[in-house]
């Protein structure tokens, strides 16, 4: 299933000195396939070559996972030091829910607009939610913050939204003993079948 946002059809009220509404970010199906506090399993995020975040891990005070696909925009300054994470090289996320009564999961791929996407993940107890969920968030308008004396000022990109259409593909997965390995295999197959990658495993000796 592909879910898309046609950016040229987004209606905004262009900001003035006193009024106006502009869109900055879009979270795509944030609670799709979210797991509850009673569920067992984990989320898969592309931190480096891949990492798992266990459901209900009780890290309530830890910072929720957030990392920009292909790294941060270096043209925008940093006000705070980011948390220690590996760079995200692949626009793919997933989750596996397993237990006595269920064994299923999914893979999601940012197919269009991934260069302005970030990967987010929270566990139950973080950010006032009882769910474990991971999703893509797309920044459609650049913003920056700076200080002038004691005043904090935030500036936004003017004009219309210049980002391409945003598309995320969702792929349900179900099999006995489903694991993150199956998510990795599903993504490999997607790259071979849809992106023209070549399978070189037969040449390995």
What annotation goes with each model-predicted range?
Residues 1-205:
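Carbohydrate-recognition beta-sandwich/jelly-roll modules
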